[in-house]
Amino acid sequence: MGKPIVAIVGRPNVGKSTLFNKLAGKRIAIVQDTPGVTRDRIYAEAEWLNYKFTMIDTGGIEPKSEDIIVSQMRRQAQIAIEMANVIIFLVDGKEGLAPADEEVAQMLRKSKKPVVLVVNKIDKLKDENNAYEFYNLGIGDPVTISSSQALGLGDMLDRVVEYFKDDESDGEDDERINIAFIGKPNVGKSSLINKLLGEERLIVSDIPGTTRDSIDSYVDTEFGEFTLIDTAGLRRKSKVKEEIERYSVIRTYASIERADVCILMIDATEGISEQDQKIIGYAHDINKAILVIVNKWDLVEKDDKTMDKFKKELKVNLSFMPYAKYLFISAKTGQRIVKVLQTAKECYDNYTKRVKTGVLNDVISQAIMMKEPPIVGTKRLKIYYVTQIGTKPPTFIFFVNDPACIHFSYQRYLENQLRENFDFQGTGIKLEFRERKEK
C-alpha cells in the first residue's frame, strides 16, 4: 500500500503554499501575495504521529474565472481531488466566507472524499469567532490555524490522520530515480512528461513560462520507478524581471541538485543557447548523469545525415561534457518517446555503477604502461593504488606519491581510460588524488 495522499485545496491566496511549506519543512511552492501564484500541483513527503503521507499543493480554484491559466488550475485541483485520500479545504479567516468558497465546497462534496475544513489566518485568540460562519459550508467542524505562525497545525494534522487506514501508515521510502527536465521556456518539457505519464499532469500552453516552479510526478515502468521533475524554463537574466521568475531559477538549480539524471531539452528548430549551456554546465559541474534530448524533431527538414550533423554541432557546444547521451524525439507525435526513460535508466545505471578493485587496478596499470605520467617540476607522478569509494557519481581515489604532480591532461587521460573500459556514458565521474608514502 502506498502512502496516503493529502491534497490542500482552496481559492487563491488563502495561504495554501505557506501551510504546505510549514508542513514540508522547506520552501517548495512559490509563495507571493498575488492571487494565482501557485499554478500547479507540487508534492512533498510529510509525517505525523508515525504516519507518512504525501501532500499536494494545488493551484487556487476560481470556479467562475474564464482566464486560461485559472481554468487549467481548476482542472489541476480536480485531478488532485481525484487522487487524494484526504482533502484539507483551506479558507481565509480574515476575509471571511466568500462565494468562491461555496463553489469549492460543492466540488469537494461531489468528490465524496474525507474533508478537513481549516480556517487559516486566525492569528489571535479573539479571531476564533471568525470561524463560525464557515459552518454554513456544511463540511463539518472547522479547525482554526495560523499557517504563518505555525499555530494549530498539530490539531489539524490529528484530524487528517484520523482518516488514514491502519495499513496505509507504513508506506516505505521510494527508491525512485529522480529525473529533472530542464531547458528554455516552451521547449516541450511538460508535453513530454505528460506523454510519459499518460495524463494531463502539467499546465501545458503556448505561453512561455507556464511551468513556474519545479513539479514532481511519479511513474512506474518496465525500466524502473521514476520521479519526473518539471522545472521552470530558464531565460536570460535581462528577461527575468518578475520576483517570481527569480524564485523559479533558484528552484531549477535546486532540482538539479536533487536529481539523479538531468535531461536537457533543446528545441530542434532553435538549437542550443548560452542559457542551455549554462544550466546543463551546472549539472555537469556537480557530476550528474546527463541526457540531451532534441525535441520537435518532426519540424525539421532532414535527410539521412541531418541527425549526425545536428549532434556534431551540439557536441561542439557541449564539449565540456563529451560523455552525454543524445536522443532525438517529438513529444507531440510520440516519436521515440519510449526510449526516453529507457535511456535515462541507462544513464542512471552508469551513475550508480561499481567497479571491482582488482579489475580497476588492472586497467589503470595498463593505462600507465601505455602512457607514462609526465614529469611535473622535478617529480614524476607515481600511482600506487586506486579504489572506488562511492557512486552518484562514481568516485575514484588514486593513492599517489604527490597529488601536486597530477597534470590536468593526464587526469583527463585516466578518466578517458575509465570511461572506455567501464562504459560511464551519460554520467560524470570524479577522480581524487591522495598522498601515500611508498613502502
UniProtKB/Swiss-Prot annotation:
Q: Which Pfam family, giving just one, matches this sequence?
A: KH_dom-like
Residues reported to bind GTP 1: 10-17, 57-61, 120-123
Q: Which GO terms describe its biological process?
A: ribosome biogenesis
Task: Domain (EngA-type G): give its ranges.
Answer: 4-168, 177-352
Disulfide bond positions: none
One molecular function GO term is: ATP hydrolysis activity
Instruction: Say which domain of life the source belongs to.
Output: Bacteria
InterPro entries found in the cross-reference section: AAA+_ATPase, G_ENGA, GTP-bd, GTPase_Der, KH_dom-like, KH_dom-like_a/b, P-loop_NTPase, Small_GTP-bd
Q: Which UniProt keywords apply?
A: GTP-binding, Nucleotide-binding, Repeat, Ribosome biogenesis
Q: Where is the KH-like domain?
A: 353-437
Q: Tell me which SMART domains the record gives.
A: AAA
Q: Which residues bind GTP 2?
A: 183-190, 230-234, 295-298
Description of how the protein assembles with itself and partners: Associates with the 50S ribosomal subunit.
What this protein is reported to do is described as: GTPase that plays an essential role in the late steps of ribosome biogenesis.
User: Which family is this sequence assigned to?
Assistant: Belongs to the TRAFAC class TrmE-Era-EngA-EngB-Septin-like GTPase superfamily. EngA (Der) GTPase family.
Matching HAMAP family = GTPase_Der
- The protein depicted here goes by the name GTPase Der
* Species name: Clostridium botulinum (strain Langeland / NCTC 10281 / Type F)
